[in-house]
């Protein structure tokens, strides 16, 4: 008699914490009610001009998507800063990050920093160190990830815990709309 063994199929989630200088990324896989750490890091843009920085973000995330093959993407939303110029620049970095996901026809989910912190720490006003500590514990990491990578992992964890996000850009819906045109 032959027994069949089925591998548990998880959902691979790429979390992104967009930034013009440093864009954090983190990949987790949700298998049942478990979260498995896949990888994390940062795309560093340097001091070049805005178009070059945006291209670095797009290219860096494109490479990460090709390498890790996520099925869904969770992105932290921009908070309105005191400085409107900074808010607009950060929005452009987010646009580059979302574009990388959309180019691969991935579903994109957005979460506020408050939602992410609430989901991961239990306190929407948690400090960065608290987020890093909880990410380390939840994923069984040996050390705290860099702040930007920790925020990206926290965003992925928030999504994995069932957050629906404020805005969903579904690849399926986009393809349906394009067929109607």
Curated annotation (Swiss-Prot):
Cofactor: how and how many bound: Binds 2 Mg(2+) ion per subunit.
Cofactor(s) required, per the database record: Mg(2+)
Keywords: Cytoplasm, DNA damage, DNA recombination, DNA repair, DNA-binding, Endonuclease, Hydrolase, Magnesium, Metal-binding, Nuclease
MF terms in GO: crossover junction DNA endonuclease activity; DNA binding; magnesium ion binding
Binding residues for Mg(2+) 2: 76
One of the GO BP terms on file: DNA recombination
SUPFAM superfamilies linked to this entry: Ribonuclease H-like
Catalytic activity field: Endonucleolytic cleavage at a junction such as a reciprocal single-stranded crossover between two homologous DNA duplexes (Holliday junction)
Pfam families in the record: RuvC
EC number: 3.1.21.10
GO CC, one annotated term: cytoplasm
Location within or outside the cell: Cytoplasm
Enzyme class, spelled out: hydrolase
Chain positions recorded as Mg(2+) 1 binding sites: 17, 148
The keyword Mitochondrion belongs to this UniProt entry's keyword annotation: no
Keyword Nucleus appears in the UniProt entry: no
Active-site residues per Swiss-Prot or TrEMBL entry: 17, 76, 148
Complexes and interactors: Homodimer which binds Holliday junction (HJ) DNA. The HJ becomes 2-fold symmetrical on binding to RuvC with unstacked arms; it has a different conformation from HJ DNA in complex with RuvA. In the full resolvosome a probable DNA-RuvA(4)-RuvB(12)-RuvC(2) complex forms which resolves the HJ.
Family affiliation: Belongs to the RuvC family.
Function description: The RuvA-RuvB-RuvC complex processes Holliday junction (HJ) DNA during genetic recombination and DNA repair. Endonuclease that resolves HJ intermediates. Cleaves cruciform DNA by making single-stranded nicks across the HJ at symmetrical positions within the homologous arms, yielding a 5'-phosphate and a 3'-hydroxyl group; requires a central core of homology in the junction. The consensus cleavage sequence is 5'-(A/T)TT(C/G)-3'. Cleavage occurs on the 3'-side of the TT dinucleotide at the point of strand exchange.
PANTHER family registered for this protein in UniProt: CROSSOVER JUNCTION ENDODEOXYRIBONUCLEASE RUVC
Protein name: Crossover junction endodeoxyribonuclease RuvC
């Amino acid at each position: 008699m032959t027994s069949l063994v089925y591998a548990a199929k998880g959902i691979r989630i790429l979390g992104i914490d967009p930034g013009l200088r440093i864009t954090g990324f983190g990949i987790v896989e949700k298998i049942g009610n478990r979260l498995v750490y896949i990888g994390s890091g940062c795309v560093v843009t340097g001091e070049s001009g805005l178009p070059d920085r945006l291209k670095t973000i797009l290219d860096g995330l494109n490479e990460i998507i090709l390498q890790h093959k996520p099925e869904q993407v969770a992105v932290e939303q921009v908070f309105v800063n005191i400085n409107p110029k900074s808010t607009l620049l950060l929005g452009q970095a987010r646009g580059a990050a979302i574009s990388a996901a959309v180019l691969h026809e991935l579903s994109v989910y957005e979460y506020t920093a408050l939602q992410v912190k609430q989901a991961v720490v239990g306190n929407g006003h948690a400090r960065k160190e608290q987020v890093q500590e909880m990410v380390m514990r939840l994923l069984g990491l040996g050390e705290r990830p860099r702040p930007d990578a920790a925020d990206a992992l926290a965003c992925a964890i928030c999504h994995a815990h069932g957050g629906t996000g404020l805005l969903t850009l579904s690849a399926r819906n986009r393809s349906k709309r394009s067929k109607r045109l």
